[in-house]
């Protein structure tokens, strides 16, 4: 009895001592500034000789000065803010939501991303189990770009079947109920990713190897590029294209007839504004310091914003009308499951899960942690579960599904700071960016051509990530056949999006059957969804084969181990770390294939 009392007293003393030391450390230089050489964060002075130096590495739980953690957290937030704010604006435009609602969705997305990132980094152990929620690493969550490839198709179908309203001229009216139905469907379908998080990662890698992930990511990026280019040319909606005289009554200038400096779609002025963003990104990549390159997309956007503001393209009424502070649920949407969207949403969560595996592997690599074994598997499990729960909660917070972003891996690699404290600061900064609604309103007020110049580059980087994954698999007959089959319908549906619209001609009273047929139509007309289903199916049924002509020096099996640079992996799949041992494991079991894929990883 006396021993237990002594133990309790010792524990209390330890807690008190730790608290005392923490309070005392607040008043020290080491706590706030430390002895870090902050010149590492500054650009190099041109035409001067400088001694080569490398910043120290800060591990996951190392003591990092508050100032350094704040600066690096801000760097992480800048690297992902463009990717977080673009999807809500694009999806809101597809639902023709009001400017006030669009402002709110951008704010809600930033707030949700900040809160869910905190949970992902903190990592919570589920009591009495071996499972976790979160990775426990510097993993940031943002709005999935895959949603951008699904939502416009779903909302377009809602307008066609009467779920969303049109006026007597056929002009699409605001459809908040359609957006709410998309949220409800996303919320329910997120249970699939939550379920998959409890499947061992090795099995998931067998089900979804690079031959599946590569073409799917390529198709996602390709399908998104058209949306970015439409914005680059002036915007989407009633102003798109140049109408004939018969179509003129329903046509408007971009972004609208009453907007300042309104012009016709595709005008040279619009193309020039978007090109200013694109050119700035290229200039920074060529002449900018390494740390600046990780935020080249945002800096390009800033340059485009300055040019467009100076030439009178901004609608300041959007910013003036926005409240100073906002929060989730200021605007709500009626939640109702839209059956035809279930299949595409399930495909979306499969893709998000595949991306999470690659991102977690990349973050572990640049954080100098294990990329194999039980500890790594636990991080993968926690990360996928964190993604699934974040998407479920985000849907209830009026935000579309979230996923682990990859661009922060480039910041970690350059700054050599994998410390979670920097991640916590990043999450808090994102939260306050969303909390102050004026900040979100700035992103809504950005002229479409300026935003299009940035998003087209972002979306193209998604496609490049898919190409990078594909380039690292053996190009034997089996893999070429799977790629060809998945690209046949996947790329075809992107190029001719309404090719399957008239396949079903049923118009009877059976609403369940109509919903089922609409679901099939959505899948067949969504390039990444049909491509994913085909590649998964063929990968499971086609036998593996050995090609003696393929070696590690073959063009189809690169052995270079690239590192995320914050540009190529803007969307969220690291092509190197997502390449698993799957092909090798299968081949060893069947004693047919001896290609050493581990060298790629």
UniProtKB/Swiss-Prot annotation:
- Specify one Pfam family: Xan_ur_permease
Alphabetized InterPro entries for the sequence: NCS2, Xan_ur_permease
Q: Report the superkingdom from the record.
A: Eukaryota
Quick check: keyword S-adenosyl-L-methionine in the entry? no
Q: Which GO terms describe its biological process?
A: pyrimidine nucleobase transmembrane transport; xanthine transport
A GO-annotated cellular component: plasma membrane
Q: Does the keyword Transport apply?
A: yes
State where the protein is found: Vacuole membrane
How is it placed in the membrane, per its record? Multi-pass membrane protein
Membrane spanning residue stretches: 64-84, 102-122, 131-151, 179-199, 207-227, 264-284, 294-314, 337-357, 424-444, 450-470, 481-501, 522-542
Q: What is its main location?
A: membrane
The entry lists its GO molecular-function terms as: xanthine transmembrane transporter activity
Q: Which UniProt keywords apply?
A: Membrane, Transmembrane, Transmembrane helix, Transport, Vacuole
Similarity comment text for this entry:
Belongs to the nucleobase:cation symporter-2 (NCS2) (TC 2.A.40) family.
Q: What is this protein called in UniProt?
A: Putative purine permease C1399.01c
Q: What is the protein's species of origin?
A: Schizosaccharomyces pombe (strain 972 / ATCC 24843) (Fission yeast)
């Amino acid at each position: 009895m006396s021993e237990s009392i002594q133990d309790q007293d010792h524990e209390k003393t330890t807690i008190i001592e730790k608290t005392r030391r923490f309070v005392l450390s607040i008043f020290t230089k080491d706590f706030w500034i430390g002895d870090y050489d902050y010149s590492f964060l500054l650009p190099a002075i041109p035409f001067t000789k400088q001694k080569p130096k490398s910043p120290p590495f800060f591990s996951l739980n190392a003591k990092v000065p508050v100032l350094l953690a704040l600066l690096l957290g801000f760097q992480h937030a800048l690297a992902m803010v463009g990717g977080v704010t673009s999807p809500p604006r694009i999806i809101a435009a597809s639902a023709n939501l009001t400017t006030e609602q669009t402002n709110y969705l951008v704010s809600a997305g930033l707030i949700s991303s900040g809160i869910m990132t905190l949970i992902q980094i903190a990592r919570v152990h589920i009591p009495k189990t071996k499972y976790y929620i979160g990775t426990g690493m510097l993993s940031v969550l943002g709005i999935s770009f895959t949603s951008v490839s699904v939502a416009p198709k779903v909302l377009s179908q809602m307008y066609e079947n009467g779920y969303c309203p049109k006026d007597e001229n056929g002009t699409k009216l605001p459809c908040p109920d359609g957006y709410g139905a998309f949220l409800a469907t996303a919320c329910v379908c997120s249970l699939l990713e939550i379920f998959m998080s409890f499947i061992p990662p090795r099995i998931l890698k067998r089900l979804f190897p690079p031959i599946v992930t590569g073409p799917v990511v390529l198709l996602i990026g390709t399908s998104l590029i058209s949306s970015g280019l439409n914005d680059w040319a002036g915007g989407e909606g009633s102003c798109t294209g140049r109408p004939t005289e018969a179509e003129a009554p329903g046509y408007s200038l971009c972004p609208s007839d009453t907007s300042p400096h309104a012009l016709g779609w595709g005008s040279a002025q619009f193309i020039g504004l978007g090109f200013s963003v694109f050119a700035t990104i290229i200039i920074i990549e060529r002449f900018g310091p390494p740390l600046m390159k990780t935020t080249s997309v945002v800096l390009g956007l800033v340059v485009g914003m300055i040019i467009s503001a100076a030439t009178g393209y901004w609608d300041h009424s959007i910013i003036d009308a926005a409240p100073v502070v906002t929060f989730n649920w200021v605007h709500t949407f009626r939640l109702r499951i839209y059956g035809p969207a279930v299949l595409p949403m399930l495909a979306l969560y499969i893709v998000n899960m595949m991306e999470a595996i690659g991102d977690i592997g990349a973050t572990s690599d640049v954080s100098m942690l294990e990329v194999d074994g039980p500890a790594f598997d636990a991080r993968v499990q926690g990360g996928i579960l964190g993604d699934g729960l974040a998407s479920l909660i985000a849907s209830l917070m009026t935000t579309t599904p979230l996923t682990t972003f990859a661009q922060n891996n480039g910041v970690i690699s350059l700054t050599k700071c994998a410390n979670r404290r920097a991640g916590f600061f990043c999450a808090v900064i994102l939260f306050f960016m969303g909390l102050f609604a004026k900040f979100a309103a700035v992103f809504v007020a950005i002229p479409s051509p300026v935003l299009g110049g940035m998003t087209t580059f972002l979306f193209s980087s998604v496609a490049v990530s898919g190409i990078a994954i594909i380039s690292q698999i053996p190009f034997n007959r089996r893999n070429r056949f799977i790629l060809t089959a998945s690209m046949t319908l996947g790329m075809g549906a992107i190029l001719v999006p309404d090719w399957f619209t008239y396949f079903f001609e049923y118009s009877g009273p059976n609403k369940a059957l109509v919903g089922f047929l609409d679901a099939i139509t959505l899948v067949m007309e969504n390039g990444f969804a049909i491509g994913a289903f085909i590649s998964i199916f063929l990968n499971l049924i086609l036998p593996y084969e050995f090609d003696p002509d393929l070696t590690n020096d073959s063009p189809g099996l690169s052995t270079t181990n690239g590192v995320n640079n914050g540009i190529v992996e803007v969307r969220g799949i690291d092509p190197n770390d997502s390449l698993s041992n799957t092909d090798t494991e299968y081949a060893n079991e069947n004693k047919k294939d001896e290609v050493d894929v581990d060298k790629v990883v």
